[in-house]
Amino acid sequence: MASEPVNGGEGIDGAREKQIIKVYKRKGKGQRKQSSFFALEAAIEKPEGLLENENDNNDVSPAETLAPEFEDPIVVVKNSIEEAALGTNSHGDKNLTEAPSENLPGDDSDKVIDKPLVEAFSQAQPQDDASLAAMDKSEEVPSQIPKAQDDVNTVVVDENSIKEPPKSLAQEDVTTVIVDKNPIEAPSQTLSLEDGDTLVVDKNPIEVSSEEDVHVIDADNLIKEAHPENFVERDTTDAQQPAGLTSDSAHATAAGSMPMEEDADGRIRIHVASTTKQQKEEIRKKLEDQLNVVRGMVKKIEDKEGEIGAYNDSRVLINTGINNGGGRILSGFASAGLPREVIRAPRPVNQLSISVLENTQGVNEHVEKEKRTPKANQFYRNSEFLLGDKLPPAESNKKSKSSSKKQGGDVGHGFGAGTKVFKNCSALLERLMKHKHGWVFNAPVDVKGLGLLDYYTIIEHPMDLGTIKSALMKNLYKSPREFAEDVRLTFHNAMTYNPEGQDVHLMAVTLLQIFEERWAVIEADYNREMRFVTGYEMNLPTPTMRSRLGPTMPPPPINVRNTIDRADWSNRQPTTTPGRTPTSATPSGRTPALKKPKANEPNKRDMTYEEKQKLSGHLQNLPPDKLDAIVQIVNKRNTAVKLRDEEIEVDIDSVDPETLWELDRFVTNYKKGLSKKKRKAELAIQARAEAERNSQQQMAPAPAAHEFSREGGNTAKKTLPTPLPSQVEKQNNETSRSSSSSSSSSSSSSSDSDSDSSSSSGSDQT
C-alpha cells in the first residue's frame, strides 16, 4: 500500500514505513519486457525535521540503505531521493526529475526507473532493531558506491552484449576455457542475484586470446581438475569458429603440431581423422625420408655380409643345380660354420650335386691357422683336444699333433643344453624315434637274439638312436656335426648289412631322407651363428700363405668320436668280407706320407677328410662339359645318385673308395692335360710369331734370326738359321697333332696319360 505524506512540521519519532521498490532488468532493444520484480523489505527511519516544508515541494529523503546483514546494498533512485551516485543532496524545482545512477548500464534512453513514490511492501520481512540506525539531519548521504561481493559464482550478462558467443560453454568441472579472439563487449550493469548479492560489470571489453587459459573458480575459490572425458574437440574446418574445450592432442593440433601420440611401448600413433591435408603431406614426407634411411642401412648391412661371405673359399659340398634360367649353381657346404656360396655358370643339362659327410674333427684350414695362438682366442677349450696316444709319435710328426688339437678347438662352440641348435637336434631325434619305422633303430641290434653271427664282422661301429639320445642328453657331443654323423651312421649300418629290397633297408632309407631334409635347416642356422661368433672377418691366410706353410697332417679317422669308447674304435682295423664293403672303416695310425692307391690296386684305402676336401675343391673348378663324365663315374658302381627337382645329388659318404679314387684320377688327368695344352699353346704362339718374323726377313736380306729363350730366369740370345716356309708348315702340323693327342688323353687313365706325356715330350725334343 502507498505511504501517507509526512508533514515537515510534525515530528514522528520511530515512525516506520514499508515501501515497495520495483527494479527492472535491462534487456536489448526490441526485447525489452518487464521482468519479475523482487520485494525487498526496507525499514527506513524518518527522524523528525528531515523533511522541511511541504509547501515548497522540496522533499528530500536520504538514500535508502539495506540492513547490515545485506553486505552488498542495492542503490535505487526515486524522485524524492538524492542522487546517491554523485554523493550530494539535490535541491531543484518543486517537481524533481529523476536522477540517473552511475551504476545503471547504457545511455539515458535505456533507463528504467520507477518515478512515483515508493510503495510499501505487501509482505515485510522482520528486521533487527539494532540494524536500523537513525540518521541525523546534518548527516550527509555517503557518496561511495558499495563494491561487489568477492564471493561470486554466477555471472549474469545480457544476451546481446556479446558479439559472438563461444561455441561450447565451460562445464563446471573444467578449468580451461579457450575462447575466440573476438572481444566480448558488455556494458556496465548492476546485476541482482537470488541471494541479494550484486555484481558490477565494467564497460571495458574482455579480450581473451584463443590460447589463453581462463580458470573458472567455484564458490570456495578452488580450482577443479579437468577431466579429459569432458573435453570437446575443436572443429578445425572453420577458422572463424571459436574453440571449445580441447584435449591435449587437439590443443597441439590447434597450435600447429602433428596429431601424434607415443605409446608406452615406444610406438607412435597418428590420428589421421583429425589432421589436415597439409599435415598429412608433411607426415608422408617424413615417413618417406625415414624409409629411405632404413633402406640405406639395410643395403649397407647386406654389402657387409657379402664381404664377409667372400672369405669362404673352402668347400665341402659341391651342389651343382639347375636354375630356372638354365644356369649352373655350385654351392659350397663350408665346414666350421662358413656359409654356402652360390656360383652360377651356364649349364643347360641336368646337374650334379655331390655332398661330403663332414667329419667332426675336420675343420676349415682358416680355423686351423687361426688356432695357432690359442691363448689369444677366448673360445679355446682344452677339453676338446684329442688324446695324444691316438696320434702318431711326436718324433715322426710334431706338427700333426698340434694341428689336430686345434682342429677340434672351435667346432664345439655354441652347442650345449639350452642352445637353439641343441633343441633343434633333440626335436629332430625325437621325431625319428617316434616315426612308424623308428622302432627298428631305437635300440642296439640284438645280435645274439637274432642270430646275426657276422654282424660285428661287417659293421665295425654299431650305432642306434637310443644311444645317440643318451649321449645328447649327457652333452657328450661337442658339435652338432657329431650328432649328425652318428645319426647317419645308424642308417648306413642298416643299409650296409641289409641288402636292397629288404624292409629294414627301405626303413633306413626313408628315415635318412627325413633326417637330411630337417638337418639342412638346422645346419644353415648353425653356420650362420658360427660365422659371427668365430670372427672370420679377421685376417685369414691366403692360398699362397698356406702353400708356404707346407702340407699338414691329415685329420684323425672320420669315425673317432667322444660318445662311446674312442680307444676301442681307433685301434680297430678295417675287416671286409667279399661282396660287402663297410661304409665307414678308417684305419688308424697312418704315417704322414700317404700315397695314393694305384688304379689296379684291388682294395683301396679310404680317403681322409682333407683328401675329400681337396677333391671337392677340384670338382668345383671343372668346366661344365666335364660334369657328365663325373656322373658316369659315380653311376658305375654306386646307387647313391638321387634325382630331385632336376638336380642330381650324390652323397659322397655313401660312395665307395674305388669311385672316389677314380674321381681323383679323373681330376688329376684333367689338370695334366690342361698343363699340356697350355704348354702347346705357348709353343704354337712362339711358332706363329717366328713364322711372321721369317716372312718379314725374306723380304729383307737377313741371314739369321734371333730367338730368345729363358732358362732359369736368365735371358740367352741364340742365333739360329732362318727356317724355310716348308719347315714352318711342318712345325705347325706337328703342333696341331700334339694338341689333339693331349686332348684325347685327358679322359684316359693315369697310366695312359703318363705314356702320352712321355711320347709327347719325346716328340717335342726331336
Swiss-Prot record:
Keywords: Bromodomain, Nucleus, Transcription, Transcription regulation. Disruption phenotype: Cell numbers are significantly reduced in most of the organs. Cell cycle reactivation is delayed in germinating seeds, and a premature switch from mitosis to endoreduplication occurs. Furthermore, a partial loss of root quiescent center (QC) identity is observed. Residues 238-250 have a biased composition (Polar residues). GO terms for cellular component: nucleus. Gene3D superfamilies: 1.20.1270.220, Bromodomain-like. Residues 597-678 form the NET domain. Residues 574-589, 736-766 have a biased composition (Low complexity). It is found in: Nucleus. Residues 416-522 form the Bromo domain. PANTHER family: OSJNBA0053K19.4 PROTEIN (PTHR45926). Involved in the activation and maintenance of cell division in the meristems and by this controls cell numbers in differentiated organs. Its action in cell cycle regulation may be directed through the RB-E2F pathway. This is Transcription factor GTE4. It comes from Arabidopsis thaliana.
